[in-house]
Amino acid sequence: MIGRISSKTTALFICDIQTSFLKTVTQIEELIINNKSLMDSCLEFKIPIIMTQHDKNLFGEIVEPLRYSSSSSSSLSNVMVFDKIAYSMYTKELAQYVKENLPNLKSVILTGLESHVCVLQTALDLLENGYEVHVIDDATTSVQPKEYKSSLKRMKQSGVFLTSTETVIYQILQSDNHPKFKKIDELIVKRLFQINNINK
């Protein structure tokens, strides 16, 4: 298992990036930018996107920038949102959806909050069900930095691939000859510009 990613057998799972975390998570702006870039790129690649919101009465709705992806000309029909109470995204409802609609799914790009709770438990469930899991380390975090670092180690011990936003996008792109190269390059430049602005 070396962690190759193909747009034909991959989905993006975005876990619980909800409004209640806006004031409690450090560097939340960068995390949202990275997730938005991944979302826009996956729409261009026609990679399915599955999002969850955990107990939205308590944690609020998905943050505004991730509720849509206006920079992409691709159809938003590729985006599904599930409500959940369990920590793991991989609920019976979601598992059934994947079985019926994504029969070729082999690998999952996983992001979101919090890394040591919902993201970790999602990763373990996906691994247990035979999927390769690629956790994007700059698109997930926890309120407590110590828990974030610990969770990455824990997931790696179980066989999760740890990677970054830009790395995984280029891994899918593979070549400048890809028909989506120009659009993806624009999205990458846009992301870097936005991150540089918030870090000034």
Curated annotation (Swiss-Prot):
InterPro entries: Isochorismatase-like_dom, Isochorismatase-like_sf, Isochorismatase_domain
Family (UniProt): Belongs to the isochorismatase family.
Signal sequence region: none
Protein's name in the database: Isochorismatase family protein 2A
Organism whose genome encodes this protein: Dictyostelium discoideum (Social amoeba)
